[in-house]
């Protein structure tokens, strides 16, 4: 949240600005929106089964592993400096609804923190996050193939990082090449 708030305030991001069409957004934006909608479906199912711990773990994994460690880390240069071009606007219009949806999804688990987060995100809104509807699942933006390809990229990256640690090769030291054998086309 603090990353988003800092740059959104500097750039004067307006959530009501005309949305960049999903088809024109970069693949990483479409991936995180797809994953968010998968999360919405899974968290709602966990809540319906009274599996609060499961819902919390799903939200935590999404925020830590996918939003923070992948989306923000890989896309942070899109938020830095320069004018508000389509790419930067797309990044804001992707991260903003992700944060709002997470605040809504996690509100039953962390009521006070999520209420503060929601009210900080949705400026001018005086209604508590507990009075607004849970985010709706949108099947039209879910791309399971894209989610699977990104999961594969994440696994490959994790393995490379583990090998670097084992060989004591600093992550700042570029590798001339890395070969990843592929046994199956999937």
What are these regions (language model features)?
Residues 11-44, 73-159, 167, 173-184:
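Acidic, turn-prone loop/beta-hairpin segments
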Residues 63-64:
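Hydrophobic residues within the alpha-helices of tandem HEAT/HEAT-like
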Residues 1-4:
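Secretory-pathway-linked proteins and extracytosolic
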Residues 56, 60:
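Aromatic-lined ligand-binding clefts that engage carbohydrates, nucleic acids, or primary amines
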Residues 47-54:
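Short helix-adjacent coil turns
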Residues 163:
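Phosphate/ATP-binding catalytic cores across multiple sugar-kinase/actin-like superfamilies
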């Amino acid at each position: 949240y603090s990353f988003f708030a800092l740059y959104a305030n500097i750039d004067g991001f307006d959530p009501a600005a005309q949305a960049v069409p999903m088809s024109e957004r970069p693949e990483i934006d479409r991936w995180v929106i797809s994953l968010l909608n998968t999360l919405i479906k899974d968290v709602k199912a966990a809540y319906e089964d009274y599996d609060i711990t499961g819902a919390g773990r799903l939200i935590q994994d999404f925020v830590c592993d996918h939003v923070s460690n992948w989306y923000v880390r890989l896309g942070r240069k899109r938020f830095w400096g320069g004018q508000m071009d389509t790419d930067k606007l797309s990044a804001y219009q992707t991260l903003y609804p992700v944060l709002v949806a997470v605040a809504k999804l996690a509100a039953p688990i962390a009521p006070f923190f999520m209420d503060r987060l929601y009210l900080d995100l949705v400026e001018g809104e005086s209604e508590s996050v507990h009075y607004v509807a849970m985010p709706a699942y949108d099947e039209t933006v879910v791309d399971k193939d894209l989610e699977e390809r990104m999961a594969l990229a994440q696994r490959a990256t994790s393995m490379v990082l583990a090998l670097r640690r084992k060989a004591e090769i600093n992550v700042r030291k570029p590798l001339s090449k890395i070969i990843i054998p592929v046994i199956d086309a999937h």
